[in-house]
Amino acid sequence: MKAVIFIMDGLGDRPNKDGNTPLKEAKTPIMDKMAKDGICGLMNAVDVGVRPGSDTAHLAILGYDPYTTYTGRGPFEACGVGVTVKPGDIAFRCNFSSVDENFIVTDRRAGRIENTSELEKELDGLKIDDVEIIFKESGGYRAALVLRGPGLSDRISDADPKKEGKRVKEIHPLDDSKEAKKTAEIVNRLLKIAYEKLDKHPVNEERRKQNLPVANMIVPRGVGQVPEIMPFTEKTGLKGACIAGTGLIKGIAKMVGLDVIDVEGCDGTPNSDLMAKACAIVETLKNYDFILVNVKGADEAGHDGNYELKKEIIERIDEMLDYITKNISKDEVYFVISGDHSTPIEEMDHSADPLPIVIWGKSVRVDDVEKFDEFSTHKGGLNWIKGTNIMPILMDLMSIAKKYGA
C-alpha cells in the first residue's frame, strides 16, 4: 500500500452571514464522494485553539512534534529555495514590501509582485563586516535571507509590523549576549541598505509608472537555526516525495528527507497549473511509497479576503481529484484530504478553526458523512484528531505500524 497526504493550504473558513463558507458552497462532487466512501473527522494540525503556521502544521502532519522540532520558519524557507544552510547560519523568511520614506508599510506583499529575480541580485552576496548575506527570492513577494559568519544568534526580534500603516520594526536582541546584539545590528544595517538599493531600482521605477506598489523593502521574520530532525524514511520506513509550489513547503520536505518533485507551472499562486500537479501525483506514485502534496491557492485567496476566488480554487482542486482518483486504485493507495490551517475570509489570516479531514482507501471504516466541509465531517469515525495523529493512523492502515506492548 501507498499513501498520499493532500493538503489544501488555508482550506478552512468561518460561516458568512448566510451560513456558508467557500468550501461548503463550492461544487465539489469528488471530495463529497471521497467523504462518502471514506472515514471522516475534524483535525487541528497543531492543537485545539492553536493558530498554526504552515510550517508547524506541515511538520505535525508529517508526524513531527512541532514543539520540539521547530526553531523558526527561516531555515525551511532558505532550504526550500536551494540554500544549503550550514550549522551556525541564521535564517529568516522575508516579504518584499512597499514602504514610504519613513519605512511605514503601505503594502505588506508589494502588490503580490510576481517576479523579484532582479531585485534579489541587489542583495545576494553582500557582506556587512564579517557576515555574508545570502538572499534568494522564493516565488512572488517571498524570499529567504541567511546570515553566515562568526558569532551570530537567532535570539533577535522580527522586523514585521504585521499590519499596513505601521513602521518596519527595528530589530532588537532578545538577550544580553554579544552574539544577539551583533546579529540585530547587522540586520538593521541590511534593511537600510535594502531600501537604498531597491527604492530606485528600474523594476520599481517601472512599477511606479504603472501605479503598482513597489517592492522597495525586505521585511525579515521567522528567524531560526537549522533544527535536528530524524529523516522521514528512518522514522516511517517509507520512501517519500513532496509536490508543492512554495519554497517553505519544499524546504520542510527537504529538511525531513523527502524528495522534492518540481512541476512546471506550479508556483504556489492561484494561477498554478493544477492539472499538471495532478498528473505529477499519479506519475510520482509509481516510484514512491508516500507523497505529501500542498496546493496553495485557497490560502492566498483567504489572506486577500476574496471569497469567490477561494471557492473557485477549491472547485479547481476538485477537478484535480477527479483526475487523480480515476488514475489510482483505492485498493493500492490511501488518500488523505485536509488542510494545514483555516484562513477565514473575515480574518484574512490563519485561525485555529478545525479542518475537515477524510481518509479514503481500502478497508477504512466508512461512516455516515456525505459531504466534505467544515460542518459535516465532525460526524465521522475519526472524530477530532491532531496533525501528529495522521501518520500513525496511515501506518496502521498500511500494516507497517509497530505494536506497542506485548
Swiss-Prot record:
Family matches, as InterPro entries: Alkaline_phosphatase_core_sf, ApgAM_prokaryotes, Metalloenzyme, Pglycerate_mutase_ApgM
CDD domains, per the entry: iPGM_like
Coiled-coil boundaries: none
The EC number(s) this enzyme carries: 5.4.2.12
Keyword Isomerase among record annotations: yes
Keywords from the UniProt entry: Glycolysis, Isomerase
GO molecular function: metal ion binding; phosphoglycerate mutase activity
Pathway per the UniProt entry: Carbohydrate degradation; glycolysis; pyruvate from D-glyceraldehyde 3-phosphate: step 3/5
Gene Ontology biological process terms in this record: glycolytic process
The reaction(s) this protein catalyses: (2R)-2-phosphoglycerate = (2R)-3-phosphoglycerate
Role of this protein: Catalyzes the interconversion of 2-phosphoglycerate and 3-phosphoglycerate.
PANTHER family linked: COFACTOR-INDEPENDENT PHOSPHOGLYCERATE MUTASE, METALLOENZYME DOMAIN-CONTAINING PROTEIN
Family membership: Belongs to the BPG-independent phosphoglycerate mutase family. A-PGAM subfamily.
Name of the protein this chain belongs to: 2,3-bisphosphoglycerate-independent phosphoglycerate mutase
Gene that this sequence comes from: apgM
